[in-house]
From Swiss-Prot:
One GO term describing the cellular component: cytoplasm
Gene it is expressed from: fliW
Similarity comment text for this entry: Belongs to the FliW family.
Its biological purpose: Acts as an anti-CsrA protein, binds CsrA and prevents it from repressing translation of its target genes, one of which is flagellin. Binds to flagellin and participates in the assembly of the flagellum.
Disulphide-bridged cysteine pairs: none
Major location (coarse): cytoplasm
Biological process, per Gene Ontology: bacterial-type flagellum assembly; regulation of translation
Highest classification ranks of the organism: Bacteria, Bacillati, Bacillota, Clostridia, Thermoanaerobacterales
Entry keyword set: Bacterial flagellum biogenesis, Chaperone, Cytoplasm, Translation regulation
Protein name as annotated: Flagellar assembly factor FliW
Amino acid sequence: MFILRLFSPAFGEIEADESQIFSFPEGLPGFSHLKKFLLIRHRDNSPFFFLIAIDEPEIYFILIEPSRLLADYHVELSCEQQGLLHLSEETPVLSLNIVRIPPEAKEMIINLKAPVVFNLQEKIARQIILDADYPVRYPIPLSKVKEKADAGTK
Protein backbone atom coordinates (compact mmCIF):
# COMPACT_ATOMS: atom_id res chain seq x y z
CA MET A 1 0.00 0.00 0.00
CA PHE A 2 1.38 3.39 -0.91
CA ILE A 3 0.85 6.75 0.73
CA LEU A 4 -0.11 9.75 -1.38
CA ARG A 5 1.10 13.15 -0.27
CA LEU A 6 -0.23 16.29 -1.84
CA PHE A 7 -0.70 19.93 -1.00
CA SER A 8 -4.09 21.57 -1.37
CA PRO A 9 -4.53 25.32 -0.90
CA ALA A 10 -7.80 24.62 0.95
CA PHE A 11 -6.58 21.75 3.15
CA GLY A 12 -2.82 22.13 3.39
CA GLU A 13 -0.62 19.03 3.39
CA ILE A 14 -2.65 15.84 2.94
CA GLU A 15 -1.53 12.25 3.44
CA ALA A 16 -3.79 9.49 2.22
CA ASP A 17 -3.49 5.85 1.30
CA GLU A 18 -4.47 4.28 -1.99
CA SER A 19 -7.81 3.06 -0.60
CA GLN A 20 -9.01 6.68 -0.68
CA ILE A 21 -8.22 7.23 -4.39
CA PHE A 22 -10.99 6.81 -6.93
CA SER A 23 -10.87 6.78 -10.70
CA PHE A 24 -13.52 8.74 -12.60
CA PRO A 25 -13.29 7.34 -16.16
CA GLU A 26 -15.23 10.30 -17.58
CA GLY A 27 -14.20 12.88 -14.99
CA LEU A 28 -16.95 15.04 -13.56
CA PRO A 29 -19.16 17.41 -15.60
CA GLY A 30 -17.06 20.47 -16.35
CA PHE A 31 -13.90 18.68 -15.21
CA SER A 32 -13.61 15.83 -17.71
CA HIS A 33 -9.81 16.19 -17.77
CA LEU A 34 -9.57 15.19 -14.09
CA LYS A 35 -9.73 11.42 -13.66
CA LYS A 36 -8.29 10.71 -10.19
CA PHE A 37 -9.77 12.03 -6.96
CA LEU A 38 -9.06 11.61 -3.28
CA LEU A 39 -12.12 11.03 -1.08
CA ILE A 40 -11.71 12.00 2.57
CA ARG A 41 -14.28 12.24 5.34
CA HIS A 42 -14.46 15.60 7.08
CA ARG A 43 -14.12 13.88 10.48
CA ASP A 44 -15.37 10.70 12.16
CA ASN A 45 -19.15 10.33 11.96
CA SER A 46 -19.50 13.51 9.93
CA PRO A 47 -21.95 13.39 7.01
CA PHE A 48 -19.49 15.50 4.97
CA PHE A 49 -16.71 14.35 2.65
CA PHE A 50 -14.23 16.18 0.45
CA LEU A 51 -13.45 15.04 -3.08
CA ILE A 52 -10.09 16.50 -4.09
CA ALA A 53 -8.64 16.35 -7.61
CA ILE A 54 -5.22 14.70 -7.37
CA ASP A 55 -3.76 16.44 -10.43
CA GLU A 56 -5.19 19.85 -9.47
CA PRO A 57 -5.69 19.80 -5.68
CA GLU A 58 -7.03 23.34 -5.69
CA ILE A 59 -10.17 21.83 -7.22
CA TYR A 60 -12.37 20.08 -4.70
CA PHE A 61 -16.01 19.34 -4.00
CA ILE A 62 -17.94 19.10 -0.75
CA LEU A 63 -20.11 15.98 -0.62
CA ILE A 64 -22.68 14.77 1.87
CA GLU A 65 -24.35 11.49 2.77
CA PRO A 66 -27.98 12.29 1.87
CA SER A 67 -29.36 9.43 3.96
CA ARG A 68 -28.22 11.30 7.08
CA LEU A 69 -30.61 14.17 6.25
CA LEU A 70 -33.33 12.87 3.95
CA ALA A 71 -34.99 9.60 4.90
CA ASP A 72 -37.02 9.35 1.68
CA TYR A 73 -34.15 9.94 -0.79
CA HIS A 74 -33.16 6.80 -2.68
CA VAL A 75 -30.66 6.29 -5.47
CA GLU A 76 -31.86 3.74 -8.00
CA LEU A 77 -29.42 2.99 -10.81
CA SER A 78 -30.41 1.61 -14.19
CA CYS A 79 -28.81 -1.61 -15.42
CA GLU A 80 -26.64 0.48 -17.74
CA GLN A 81 -25.46 2.72 -14.89
CA GLN A 82 -24.71 -0.33 -12.74
CA GLY A 83 -22.69 -1.76 -15.62
CA LEU A 84 -20.66 1.44 -16.01
CA LEU A 85 -19.73 1.19 -12.33
CA HIS A 86 -19.12 -2.61 -12.46
CA LEU A 87 -21.71 -3.15 -9.73
CA SER A 88 -23.23 -6.41 -8.61
CA GLU A 89 -25.56 -7.06 -5.69
CA GLU A 90 -22.53 -7.78 -3.46
CA THR A 91 -20.49 -4.71 -4.43
CA PRO A 92 -20.02 -2.21 -1.60
CA VAL A 93 -21.32 1.16 -2.78
CA LEU A 94 -21.27 4.68 -1.39
CA SER A 95 -23.59 7.34 -2.78
CA LEU A 96 -22.86 10.99 -1.97
CA ASN A 97 -24.23 14.28 -3.25
CA ILE A 98 -22.44 17.47 -4.16
CA VAL A 99 -23.18 20.36 -1.84
CA ARG A 100 -22.77 24.09 -2.26
CA ILE A 101 -22.52 26.22 0.85
CA PRO A 102 -22.55 29.91 -0.08
CA PRO A 103 -20.47 32.20 2.17
CA GLU A 104 -22.44 33.42 5.19
CA ALA A 105 -25.40 31.30 4.15
CA LYS A 106 -28.06 29.93 6.45
CA GLU A 107 -28.66 26.98 4.16
CA MET A 108 -26.74 24.69 1.87
CA ILE A 109 -27.80 23.51 -1.56
CA ILE A 110 -27.66 19.78 -2.37
CA ASN A 111 -27.75 18.36 -5.89
CA LEU A 112 -30.17 15.46 -5.45
CA LYS A 113 -30.56 14.84 -9.19
CA ALA A 114 -26.97 13.74 -9.81
CA PRO A 115 -25.34 11.78 -6.97
CA VAL A 116 -21.72 10.68 -7.11
CA VAL A 117 -21.71 6.89 -6.81
CA PHE A 118 -18.56 5.08 -5.64
CA ASN A 119 -17.75 1.42 -6.23
CA LEU A 120 -15.76 0.86 -3.03
CA GLN A 121 -14.34 -2.45 -4.22
CA GLU A 122 -12.93 -1.42 -7.62
CA LYS A 123 -12.29 2.21 -6.63
CA ILE A 124 -14.21 3.71 -9.54
CA ALA A 125 -16.88 6.39 -9.39
CA ARG A 126 -19.20 8.41 -11.59
CA GLN A 127 -21.66 11.21 -11.23
CA ILE A 128 -24.98 9.69 -12.28
CA ILE A 129 -28.07 11.59 -13.45
CA LEU A 130 -31.10 9.89 -11.95
CA ASP A 131 -34.36 9.31 -13.80
CA ALA A 132 -36.29 10.15 -10.62
CA ASP A 133 -37.74 13.63 -10.27
CA TYR A 134 -35.24 15.06 -7.79
CA PRO A 135 -34.13 18.71 -7.85
CA VAL A 136 -30.65 19.88 -8.83
CA ARG A 137 -30.88 22.53 -6.11
CA TYR A 138 -32.42 21.34 -2.87
CA PRO A 139 -31.98 23.76 0.06
CA ILE A 140 -31.43 22.47 3.59
CA PRO A 141 -31.01 24.79 6.60
CA LEU A 142 -27.52 24.55 8.08
CA SER A 143 -29.13 24.26 11.53
CA LYS A 144 -30.72 20.95 10.45
CA VAL A 145 -27.37 19.70 9.13
CA LYS A 146 -25.62 20.58 12.39
CA GLU A 147 -28.38 18.90 14.41
CA LYS A 148 -28.09 15.67 12.38
CA ALA A 149 -24.28 15.75 12.44
CA ASP A 150 -24.26 16.22 16.22
CA ALA A 151 -26.70 13.32 16.62
CA GLY A 152 -24.30 11.10 14.65
CA THR A 153 -21.47 11.73 17.12
CA LYS A 154 -23.41 10.66 20.20
